[in-house]
């Protein structure tokens, strides 16, 4: 009788031990960062809510560009950039717009603070993941690639549209605190729509429904 020898077992494959990363624990704290902090809000808005709105709107704008205007944008990436676009504010807090842009010196100094905060966030990632998130948190603003430049314009427009929607919601709630902010933000968005037909389409087709009741929406 032949007795077969047991097959040799291959040694277990062990993945390299990696240090714990605090990146997503930090990102989860977006919910604690309050926006519009210098203004009386009928309903406070946190950074996490704003990030989701910007991501959804940015994805829509990119999709409009691809479907209607012959663009070849990566709509998923546009949404991701929108989702993380204010992540540095977890560290810096939300700087009110009138203060941030009060003069060129403050604006430039704040941008440097933002860049440092982004680097701090990226430093918490595992080394092999850092390049992926570097491209999302700090996209190539000086890129010569036309699609990349257009992507960042759409994310900026989505950010302003989200702010306009917040102003509309506050006005509908009877809060006169946001009247001036709504007028100035709407003016900025209208200017953007001159160069970005996707923004014009969003304003014409989607924006009017904001502020309606649930019965009106359905």
Residue ranges and their predicted role:
Residues 1-218:
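Alpha-helical, largely C-terminal catalytic domains
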């Amino acid at each position: 009788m032949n007795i077969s020898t047991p097959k040799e077992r291959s040694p277990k494959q062990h993945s390299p031990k990696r240090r714990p990363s605090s990146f997503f624990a930090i990102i989860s704290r977006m919910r604690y960062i309050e926006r519009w902090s210098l203004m009386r809000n009928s309903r406070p808005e946190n950074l996490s809510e704003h990030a989701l709105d910007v991501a959804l709107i940015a994805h829509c704008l990119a999709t409009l560009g691809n479907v209607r205007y012959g663009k070849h944008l990566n709509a998923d990436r546009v949404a991701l950039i929108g989702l993380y676009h204010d992540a540095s504010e977890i560290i810096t807090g939300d700087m009110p717009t009138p203060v941030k842009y009060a003069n060129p010196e403050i604006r430039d100094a704040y941008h440097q603070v933002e860049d440092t905060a982004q680097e701090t966030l990226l430093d918490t990632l595992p080394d092999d993941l850092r390049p992926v998130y570097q491209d999302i948190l700090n996209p190539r603003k000086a890129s010569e690639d036309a699609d990349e430049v257009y992507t960042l314009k759409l994310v900026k427009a989505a950010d302003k549209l989200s702010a306009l929607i917040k102003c509309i919601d506050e006005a509908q709630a009877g809060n006169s605190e946001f009247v001036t902010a709504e007028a100035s933000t709407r003016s900025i968005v209208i200017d953007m729509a001159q160069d970005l037909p996707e923004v014009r389409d969003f304003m014409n087709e989607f924006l009017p429904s904001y502020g309606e009741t649930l019965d009106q929406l359905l």
